[in-house]
Amino acid sequence: YVDWYGYSASVSPYILEQFEKEAGYRFRPEYIIDQGYYNNQYRVPSREFKDFQAFQRREVAKIAKEMVDITHEYGKEAMMFLGDHWIGTEPFMEEFATIGLDAVVGSVGNGSTLRLISDIEGVKYTEGRFLPYFFPDTFCDGGDPVKEAKENWITARRAILRKPIDRIGYGGYLKLTLNFPEFLDYVENMCNEFRELYTNAKGITPYCVKKVAVLNSWGKIRSWGCHMVHHALYQKQNYSYAGIIEVLSGAPFDVHFISFDDILAEPELLKDLDVVINVGDGDTAHTGGSIWENAAVSSAIREFVYNGGGFIGVGEPSGHQFQGHYFQLADMLGVEKETGFTLNYDKYN
């Protein structure tokens, strides 16, 4: 299986011993195995898994900093490639800045993946590696690298106007491009476009209509990565949900990612927002699952809407069967899902 955000490959006897000393309780294999789901981003994270994540972030940051320090001693910049598997080096969490990286580079698949890179703070610059890679599967007889390059650039370009990356590039075997001069011409034009966009957008606060927050179980740790399975690849089962995040990447909004834990810890944060978005299938981390059994959560959202805030639900927002409802905000949303338990309602003998 693939999981960029997974921690299942980060377990060792040494790590478990250290974790148990810090957390004060025994680590169990089930905390990672998670009924066979391995804590993928659709699973509502357990307290133990969140503890383990926090522990790994701190430990990985320490080790990564040692590597960065060695690099700096040799007078070189330290750059990290974002992607595939970044155990512990969570770019949107506080520990990341302590590593001391000079730059982050990542592969750009769409607007969301571009913002995943460009929104990272605590580095001197960010870089996007565009598609296609210079590999034989594209640069071959019958291949059309220009088409792929156009789709990639046009898809990601709108996000640059909201938050630009600092550099762009490609990866692969350069000699493969020699037989595709039209591709080289297109890349030249694309680079000129980028320079124009960057000159006008860098350091400028773009116009924002409203302040919007995506609400889920993860919050800022999964900023711009919501519903993203294996680098922006199309998934029939979730494209409508991932599409919401993609739209936000280039829309005129000040976008934030908040968790239910954030609301429980500081309900007042909702007062600074104009719109809250809850998007995904019911009983997943993206809509919250059993967290809606906590009256403090639903009360905070209701108060937010009562005071003029907007709430947008896509899919099954607040979806969790509890106390006679599937949508825990059914009264507020004006809609309910029939799950079989109320088929006998509104009927006559």
Question: Which residues does each predicted region cover?
Answer:
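A glycine-rich, often tryptophan-bearing local segment used as a flexible ligand/cofactor-contacting loop or short
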Residues: 283, 287-349
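Acidic (Asp/Glu)-rich catalytic clusters
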Residues: 94-98, 114-126, 160-163
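Polysaccharide-binding and catalytic clefts of secreted carbohydrate-active enzymes
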Residues: 1-101, 107-116
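Aromatic-Pro/Gly-enriched surface loop or interdomain linker
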Residues: 157, 163, 185-273, 315
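The substrate-binding groove and active-site-proximal loops of carbohydrate-active enzymes
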Residues: 44-61, 99-108, 132-148, 171-174, ...
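Active-site clefts of carbohydrate-active enzymes
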Residues: 117-148, 176-180, 220
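A short helix->loop->beta-strand "cap" motif at the edges of active sites that frequently abuts
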Residues: 75-76, 123-124, 307-310
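Hydrophobic faces of well-ordered beta-strands that scaffold small-molecule active sites
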Residues: 78-82, 102-106, 124-133, 166-171
